[in-house]
Amino acid sequence: MPNLQQTASQSQSQHHLHPHHLRPHQQQHHQQQQQQQQQQHTHHQQQQQHHSDFPLPDGWDIAKDFDGKTYYIDHINKKTTWLDPRDCYTKPQTFEDCVGDELPMGWEESYDPNIGPYYINHLAQSTQLEDPRQEWKTVQEQMLSDYLSAAQDQLENKREMFDVKQQRLLWAQEEYNHLKLAASRSSLCSSSSSMSRHDPELLRADLMLARERVHQLKQELTHITNDISYTERGMNTLYSVGEKINARENGCYDIAEVQAIREEMLKVHKSLVSGEKVREELMRSLVQIKNELGRQQISEENSDLASPFDRVCVASQTDLCGSSGDNLNGGARFAEMAKTKLQYAEWRKHIKKLQQQLADHVERIEPGQLESDKDRILLIQEKEKLLNDLNSISLKSRSEEEKRVIHQTRHKLEEDLKEAYEANNTCVANRLRFHEEKQLLLDKLQEALKSTKLLEERLKSFSSESTFSISSGSSLGSLSTASSKSALSFTDIYIDPFAVDSPIDVVDLRRRSQRLFQQHQQQRLHPVHPVLQQQQSAEVTLSPRSSLSMETPPASPMKYNAGADQTPQALKEEPTYANALPAPPAYTAPPPVPISGVRARPYDLDSTVLDCMMLEAKLQKLNMGTPLNLAAAPLSPISEKPSLLDLPQEMLSRSSSTSNTRSVSAAVSNESVAGDSGVFEASRAHLPRKELAQVQIGLKYLKQEGVLVVSLERANNLLALWTASADNSQVYLRAALLPNSLTSIRTKALGDFQKPVFNDTFAVPITLDKLLTKSLQVTVVTMTGQKEEIIGTVQISMAEFNPEDSTLKWYNVLSSKFIPSFESLDIPSTSAAAAAAAVAASNAPNSGNNREESSDESTITSSQTSTLTRNQAPCMELQEQIAAELLELGPLNEPECSDDDDDDEEEELDDKQLVSDVGLMNSSGMLDAYLQNMKQEFADKETNTDRAYLPEKSRGQSQLMDDRPVKRSQTFTPSAAVSKNRYNCRLNRSDSDSAMHCGVAPHTFQRGAAERRSLRFHTKAPKSVTKLHHTHIPRTSLDLELDLQAQHSKLYFLNDQIAKLQNLKEVLQKACENKDPLVAAWAIENEEFQRLVARADPAKCPEERQLQKLLMKTAKEIHKLRKTKVPKGCPDLVSFKEKITFFTRKGLSVPELPSEFTLPEANPIEEEEEEEDEDEFYNSAETAIAINTALVASSNRNKNLSEHPHRATSGAVPKLPAPVATPAATPAATPVATPVATPVATPAATPVVSPAVQTDAKPAAAPIPVASSDAEQQRFDYVVDRNYGVEV
């Protein structure tokens, strides 16, 4: 046997005998080759052990290839093969005989570092990507066929909507021509007052409205045409993919083709990246041109006024996050850091919870179903509007044929609407409810990300070395089974903000669906006369002149009863001001208590007031259970908003506002009527001022004397705060500058609670720099005999005070009933303050000054921070506790060292720890976090050996032990008098070996490396991340082909967008140079253009851009999280449905400048010649004939559709109709020229064309059908039109 092997090896070397079917070999890295060879060696070693019981047949031998692969030699037939001849005895013959993960004879599973696992069929000498044991490919083909059938129905709905809107355009055109004719007749008869039936001004207004209606309908036709072409192109792509896969043998790609497709996808991705840069540059230039056009228009209207684009907002020029951490001293800084960390952790948990809820919610939503429901509902509304137009037509001037056609069309529309109402049942409402819940979760997620971003910036401000991130670094969503870094994942291809258009307003869509269903129920219970039905429908639906577009269907919020669907939960989750520090979301705002003595009336709650209420509720949560210092929170003297806690209960219960400041009033008034414009804006509800308690305060600063003049003038409606229980009750005002004010000023006491007039002026000596760190607190105090009671307070931040001007303003008073333990906020009188100062001076004569200065410095720093964060002043209760602790613990904390420098440092440390201890006294968890941070702070003072070092034990246990602190200099002295049980000194020097994180480092140590700081706290990836690979079904050939076509589609539309943007840029530049007012007005007023440039507006704040990036990252994380929930071995149906729906979703639309901004305006005043009037007659007649022809054609088409409905064949991909050229199939100019920039042309990729889509450059302006020759020669008689009083 050995001689036979040697002979075989010599024969092979001489004749170059190689296996007939070699595996594809790629040039890989040395490490990847070793792993692959090791896996193959292990597999064949196990196989050899399994075959060791059976000897090789006669004439067979074993050999190894150059890469270590074992093959077998048949010396009898002089052939080589990879198949072991003993497999016929050990392996099953067919797939039906396989058990578990077995493969039949002739099949082998292999692995490629770039592609991942694939399968080799040695019998057919082929390779494939799919696992032959799974039926996933068949399921995918069936899902593709079902979706194409549903997409065909959706396309038919779009085409039917196009036909209905085109009929509306014809009727609008006829109305415009009729009005134009009436205006010309009125101008001709203007000399005779008896012949003039109508006012020329009214005719001119009606003519303008009709022209706007025609223009609006043409724009809507353009949108529908684009939607149809986009859907057709997507369906053509899916058809071509299905036919290409079916044309392959076994419907699978081999490994060489898979590798080629992968390389092509990477090349297309590079082209996409470069093209996106070009698109962003074009959009930025469009923003500049739009701003320039706006400046020109404003300068033409009023050259004296300055342009708003040149104004800079100076409302807040302070970086709140960056300066808050620097202004705090040691103790307060760590207290704020610990509090912020807890809040940050709570928000992170809330974000993870929302992501999990969104991942669970996606499984209940069918991809692409929302678009179909939207088209179905909009089609119903279009038919309603067409029916209204037909009902408004006067039949007296019509011929019998026209009357018959109009009656038939009305009957057909009524039948269609009846069927549509029945189809729009509870299932559609439930689906829309799921989408509305998803939108609500997305809104919550956006608010959570915004709050987390603010907390993240605040944490970064505390320490420059700290870096926080809310994005996960794991790559769980990669669909490459080999996890190659260069592979494109599902999120890279199908989650693109520019690949889809603006999202659908699900709330508005659901309201429309509910309205249609309710209207159908009312019609079933109470049949209505057609005319009355028309009037009721007109009240709900918009008029033909509405600003309805396919992207953002408008609807008046008053029409759908916006407050009916609101819940108290929506009120609790109201977003607050952006500059307020967010609170953990688990907080539930307590219901406000109505004030006794105030008459509760059902006022409409203003949205600004609602924002204030939610701001106060979240500020309560910030203090972590401590009494809220709302008394120290000044109210803005500019807005003068009332306190939300003083609002009646009925007013709060009737609130239905949302986060939008342009809220909708719940009362129906003349101002809430939207009319025919489709634009709605409700007036704000004005709260009565007499229900609020107010105080008038004047402020003026004298720089030369250094004195603040405070004038307490008068008050108003103090009975809202307190009801006098006796006749001898009096009221006075008391004021003080906080913090640490030992004196206070007060006015005289008056018995008038309704409108007391004090007129007291006081001078407070204070320097200007200290004044800006203070807050003026004014309290309202009542006296009944010898008893005094504080009933309200006002606080004014002096940081906003302008010392150059004198102010006299009204301030709202916050009631003391809503502040727990309000007595502790009482300001000490002059005598009490003097006594407290005397006690402090007698108890601590030596160190009292230093302590008072340190405490004052800390509180002033806290006051500065509160001023920067807009009216979050420190609590007086906290200051009093700090002062009390200083007086009591002062002698005990005196250092026992003779060194004066060390004494000062130790006193400063004691003060810092004391301040922070008092601030964290409210929560045990916060106290533990603070003590931990304090230990790290004192332990990590780098290498300063002269600094006093506090012991490890807490201060509460220090009385039982030696209280002397351990100095770093004494730790190196053998004679230091320090007990052994207390000796614990850590020297963590910065950028040294001892600063490394305790534990096993995942990386090798490199001295002087730049990335050492990040290596210190490097965390290992969780084990669950590494186990996620190879748990799902790998990609099939259909998946691969869909990914490739998706990349090509994105590149095609990107090139189309670039071409349109370039054309738009050139037109706007010429208009800017020529100062064209029409183009400037279009650029400023067009909503679609405004949405487009808003994406790349450089004036957009960086926080919003970062928030959009975080939303994109979160969307990818949600997809990854959802994929991890798919059981092992089960197909991901939702992801595949999202893939195929990607092709029919409308992308980002670039607006096109209309060729004619307005129709030619008729001049009803000037006289025209008779020949032009006759031309108008004939044009009107031709339009009427065209309308009749279109109605008959639409009726025949609907009849054919009802008789021959579309049914797609199941189990196979539907065939394409005859190819017809469309504008969608014509490639646009491609600025990004690459070899793979154009999609792969296939014979099956023929577009599906709609009969309604014209090949004209402007399909929206569909040409009116030409009348027959008989109709042109028909003679028309003049008939008096009773609507307009003219002959037609």
Swiss-Prot record:
GO terms for biological process: border follicle cell migration; negative regulation of glial cell proliferation; negative regulation of organ growth; positive regulation of apoptotic process; positive regulation of hippo signaling; R8 cell development; R8 cell fate specification; regulation of DNA-templated transcription. Residues 541-550 have a biased composition (Polar residues). It comes from Drosophila yakuba. Residues 15-28 have a biased composition (Basic residues). The lineage of its organism: Eukaryota, Metazoa, Ecdysozoa, Arthropoda, Hexapoda. Keywords: Cell membrane, Coiled coil, Cytoplasm, Membrane, Phosphoprotein, Repeat, Transcription, Transcription regulation. Residues 201-229, 335-463, 1049-1076 form a coiled coil. Residues 691-811 form the C2 domain. This is Protein kibra. Residues 1-14, 29-49, 857-869 have a biased composition (Low complexity). The gene is Kibra. Residues 942-966 have a biased composition (Basic and acidic residues). Its main location: cytoplasm. Belongs to the WWC family. KIBRA subfamily. Regulator of the Hippo/SWH (Sav/Wts/Hpo) signaling pathway, a signaling pathway that plays a pivotal role in organ size control and tumor suppression by restricting proliferation and promoting apoptosis. The core of this pathway is composed of a kinase cascade wherein Hippo (Hpo), in complex with its regulatory protein Salvador (Sav), phosphorylates and activates Warts (Wts) in complex with its regulatory protein Mats, which in turn phosphorylates and inactivates the Yorkie (Yki) oncoprotein. Kibra acts synergistically along with Ex and Mer to regulate the Hippo signaling pathway. It comes from the Eukaryota. It is found in: Cytoplasm; Apical cell membrane. GO terms for molecular function: kinase binding; molecular adaptor activity. Forms a complex with Mer and Ex. Interacts (via domain WW 1) with Ex (via RXPPXY motif). Interacts with Mer, Sav, Hpo and Wts. Residues 896-910 have a biased composition (Acidic residues). Residues 1-60, 541-560, 841-870, 890-913, 942-972, 1253-1272 are annotated as: Disordered.
